[in-house]
Amino acid sequence: MISSPKIKFGVHTFIWKKEFLGNEEYVFQDAKRWGFDGIEIATHYFDQIDPLQLKSYGEKYGVELTFCTSLPRGLSLTTKDEDCWRESIAYLERAIKFCQQCGIIQLSGPFPHPVGYLSGEPLQKRENVRMQEAFKLVAETLIKTDLKFAVEPLNRFQGYALNTVAQGLELLDAVDCPQLGLLLDLFHMNIEEKDVIKAFLQASNHCFHIHACAKDRGTPGSDSFAWGHWFKALQTMDYQGWVTIESFNFEDKELANGARLWRTVAPSNEALAQDGLKFLRQTYQTN
């Protein structure tokens, strides 16, 4: 058994809604009541959010904040369109600035291109070079902060530029920035990795952040995944970051449709969050 907690447990705002807009105090009330250590704020509209208001909510309810975003439609780090490419880099730089203003030190997301964009071909060499060059420029901004920046590989149905841990490590090696790492999402990994636990061990200290859910996007622990062995792997890695429950509010039809949820995967979003947290904590503490 572990002697002291190294892992913190968070909940993603997709549990409630698609876009966090800054005034949803009920999110903080729920997360605190459910027993989470923190909240992962997800939005494309961070330019319109008051950082001081966000900080005040976190302080009022005693929960820490992490931040998640992705490139909006029309942007891309793999494009040959110079204006689009520059605008995409600028978007990520603004996200970094927003995190600084909020006192957030963990920024994560699927950044190479918008979620769901597929080119119809595997990642081309010129696109890979373009992506690496973009992250090198982002790293120039990143190293002036205390922020950890985690890039998420997506499954093949939602992205084509980064699908596996191996591809992610190749990107990190090319960029060579200690503040750049990987967000590893169990849903995507259960599709793309032949051995999820081996992939985590391969990522090792390059794993900066984790999204957890069952294989069907449901409650952690309600599936056949080897959760106990997985937590042992995290201990082997000496992982000390966040394990954040990410699933999607089925009642938010735009969000559910985007995640291809055609049926409920838990009795309720509250049950998914609470039962998932209870299971994760208990499994972590007994391994």
From Swiss-Prot:
Chain residues that bind substrate: 188, 217
Identify the EC number(s). Answer: 5.1.3.-
What keywords does the record list, in alphabetical order? Carbohydrate metabolism, Isomerase, Manganese, Metal-binding
Q: Which residues does Mn(2+) bind?
A: 152, 185, 211, 246
Tell me which Gene3D superfamilies the record gives: Divalent-metal-dependent TIM barrel enzymes
Active-site residues are 152 (proton donor/acceptor), 246 (proton donor/acceptor)
* InterPro entries documented for this protein: Sugar_Epim/Isomerase, Xyl_isomerase-like_sf, Xyl_isomerase-like_TIM-brl
Among its keywords, does the record have Cell membrane?
no
Instruction: State a single Pfam family of this protein.
Output: AP_endonuc_2
Family assignment from sequence similarity: Belongs to the hyi family.
Q: What is this protein called?
A: Probable ketose 3-epimerase
Question: What is the source species?
Answer: Synechocystis sp. (strain ATCC 27184 / PCC 6803 / Kazusa)
Lineage per the UniProt record: Bacteria, Bacillati, Cyanobacteriota, Cyanophyceae, Synechococcales
